[in-house]
């Protein structure tokens, strides 16, 4: 079989979406599958020779790893060369600088998507690009609309492991409190980050079981008030009373149902009222 290694520059896996305990749990689950994980590794050079394999990776800490085959996963890099040549302002870490209206340093030129840098941040996801496009169009038409950032919540399956990160997954909001559920036998870790008054969900981390993701995401996006015991949202059914869920009737019309195309509950209701009564018709 093939011996597989994961080399990560950050101190933990998925450090944007997961907290430290979530990252450690993910690492344990991946390593239990036989995959070796190396974190805090800065690759200095790759040499086309080795005593045990075809290539040798040299890291900044002096260590090395011999491998036969390398797959790079480097994310996105904003293409801002044209903007630089035109004299437009470019962010220090790359990307064409834009304001809340998606205007560049030249107010007659707009930039959206992965080439744009808003508040020194480049979004590598499609949903923020759609949101930027809407803001730019509205501004061109004279309507008031502003880009104020985008939700980077994500749910995915990494090497067969269910992982989810929502909102302030690191609990950086001042006064934030946490509820943690850990089942070591089933390798499940869940954490809720709530406001100081215990009424608003600020973020969540899910590793090993993401069945609560949709419910928690709507609570965060729509600032819906939490039940009296927020931990009931992540505790298993056998731990007590039934798990509370958010019914569609409780969601505001502005609630986002599809992030890729920015479809809201109100959009779906309007389509249904116009005669779209099947899933195919709604699509």
What function would you assign to each model-found segment?
Residues 2-45, 129, 147-163:
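Rossmann-like dinucleotide-binding cores of NAD(P)H-dependent redox enzymes
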Residues 4, 10-12, 16, 52-53, ...:
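Residues forming the flavin
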Residues 49-50, 99, 195-200:
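Short acidic-glycine loop/turn motifs at beta-strand connectors
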Residues 115-214, 239-270, 276:
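Mid-to-C-terminal Rossmann-like scaffold of FAD/NAD(P)H-dependent oxidoreductases
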């Amino acid at each position: 079989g093939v011996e597989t290694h994961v080399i990560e520059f950050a101190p933990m896996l998925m450090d944007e979406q997961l907290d430290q305990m979530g990252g450690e749990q993910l690492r344990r689950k991946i390593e239990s599958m036989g995959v070796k994980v190396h974190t805090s590794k800065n690759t200095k050079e790759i040499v086309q020779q080795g005593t045990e394999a075809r290539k040798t990776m040299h890291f900044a800490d002096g260590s090395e790893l011999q491998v036969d085959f390398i797959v790079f996963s480097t994310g996105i890099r904003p293409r801002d060369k044209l903007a630089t040549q035109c004299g437009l302002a470019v962010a220090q870490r790359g990307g064409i600088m834009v304001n809340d209206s998606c205007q560049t340093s030249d107010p007659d030129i707009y930039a959206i998507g992965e080439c744009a840098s808003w508040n020194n941040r480049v979004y590598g996801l499609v949903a923020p690009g759609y949101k930027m496009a809407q803001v730019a169009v509205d501004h061109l038409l004279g309507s008031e609309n502003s880009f104020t950032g985008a939700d980077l919540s994500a749910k995915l399956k990494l090497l067969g492991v269910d992982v989810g990160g929502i909102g302030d997954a690191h609990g950086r909001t001042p006064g934030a409190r946490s509820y943690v559920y850990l089942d070591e036998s089933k390798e499940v870790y869940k954490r809720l980050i709530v406001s100081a008054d215990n009424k608003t969900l600020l973020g969540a981390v899910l590793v090993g079981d993401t069945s609560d993701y949709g419910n928690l995401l709507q609570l965060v996006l729509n600032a819906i008030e939490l039940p009296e015991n927020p931990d009931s949202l992540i505790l298993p059914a056998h731990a007590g009373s039934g798990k509370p869920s958010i019914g569609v009737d409780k969601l505001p019309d502005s609630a986002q149902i599809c992030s890729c195309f920015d479809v809201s509950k109100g959009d779906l209701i309007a389509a249904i009222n116009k005669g779209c009564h099947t899933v195919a018709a709604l699509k």
